Structure formats: C-alpha cells, structure tokens
Amino acid sequence: MQIACKQAECMPGEPSAASPRSSPVGVGDVVVLEPGEAASFDAPLDLLVFALPVTPDRSVPRAIRPDWDPRITDTPGGCATDGKAYRRILLTWRGEVGPYTFHGLNVHRVRIDDSFTHYHPRVGGFDEFYLVQAVREGARLLTSVRTETIQQPASVRREDVPQLLQSMPLQQGDLVYLPRGVAHRGLGGVLAQVITVPGFVPGAEIGIDHHLHAINERLGLSGKEALPVHAAGALQPIVR
C-alpha cells in the first residue's frame, strides 16, 4: 500500500505547494503529517489519528516503518523483557532507547506474553492506548481501578479480593484506553501498538506485583483464589 502526502492547496498569491511525497505503508507503521499537510492512500485502510499541538522535528522520518527501518531493531524491555522479544521502538522519550525521539506521543510495537503489573501515576505519568494488531488464543489484559487499595495490602480483606483485578479478553482490532492510575498487565501473546501521551516518561511505570504477592501471603490465598502475580516483581518493587 502507498501513501501520498502534499501540502494543502495554496491560496492566490501564496507560494506553490511542495511536490507530493510518497511511501509504502502497512500495519504497524506510523505516518507523521506536518501542519496543513494532507494524505491520500491507494487502498482502503483503518487509521488511528492523533492531532497534536507540536510535530516531531525533521530528524524523525515522516513514515516510520518498524519492520523495514534498519535503525529499528528488537529492544527487550518494558512489557516484553525476554531476550527474544519482538519490541520495536518507533517514537520514544530518550535517545538511548530508540533512534527517533518526541515529547508529545510515543509508540512502541510490542508482542506481550507476560508483562509485570504496573500503573502510570496521575501526576507525572502518561495515558496509554493498546491498538491490538494480532493475538494468540487466550490473550488477555488484566486491569484494576483499585490501584490505591492494592498498594495498601494490610487493608485488603478476603471479600475485597475478587474485585481487585478484572480480566479482559483481547481481539484483533481492539483499542484499549488505559488512563493514568489504572493498573494493567498483558498476558498470553498480544501484538499491540502501545501508544502513550505525552510519552514513556522515565520512572512512570510503577510495579505493584510485590503488593499483590503481599496480599496473597497475608490472606493465605493459593490456587484459583490467589491474585495473579508476575514472578519478577513479586519480591521487590519494579520502577521503570
């Protein structure tokens, strides 16, 4: 599939519009448009569009193609820490993480098999979207709006436990919004475009698996009664 981009038509007396630019695009790619620029495609497709007050600088390609750009390679971390993880960094906050930086919106394309349970703080954090592009059977997302309760294990009663985490099955084409403060954990093999606004702010991924583990231990929960816990975060806090 091809995309063609050009500046909007000029009014009389204005300089002529620049020549159109074109690029192949596919699932997982990001297209950056300048203010006043229009885009056309040679085939139907679904797009998720963000209008931002600022645009990435010219060092960022106007079409970012994670499976074709030699500067973008698998970088384990975040929600996919396995050494063989598929994790492509399209737009990110820090230059040491990926080649293209932007403090307005970040995009990582990730296959999530088993992430740690975490949230992003309301102050100094970020909002997150999962645009689901492929799933394995059984892929799901655990979420919780009771993050503050989980962070106080001594206050949790046995009857509170069933309401602490919710399990959401995922399907290709889903768009999941995870506002600041909502805890979440991906499981089972979901390939998602993970989009954050304003971006992956350092230190704003706060793990809570050690709190979930503490609740299980304190209440003597085991088997199906126990809260699901990511092993790496069970015994010590994770902050990324």
Where are these regions (language model features)?
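Short, conserved beta-strand element in jelly-roll/cupin
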Residues: M1-A18, R122-R157, V197
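N-terminal accessory/assembly segment that mediates macromolecular interactions
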Residues: M1-P66
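Short, flexible, glycine/charge-rich loop motifs used to bind or transfer phosphoryl groups or to couple energy/partner
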Residues: R21, Y119-H120, Q166
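Conserved metal-binding segment of the jelly-roll/cupin
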Residues: P24-A43, L52, Q163-G189, I195-V197
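Extracellular structured ligand-interaction cores
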Residues: G28, L47, F102-G104, F126, ...
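Double-stranded beta-helix
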Residues: A43-Y86, L187-R240
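A short glycine-rich, His/Asp/Glu-containing loop-to-beta-strand
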Residues: R87-Q133, R140-S144
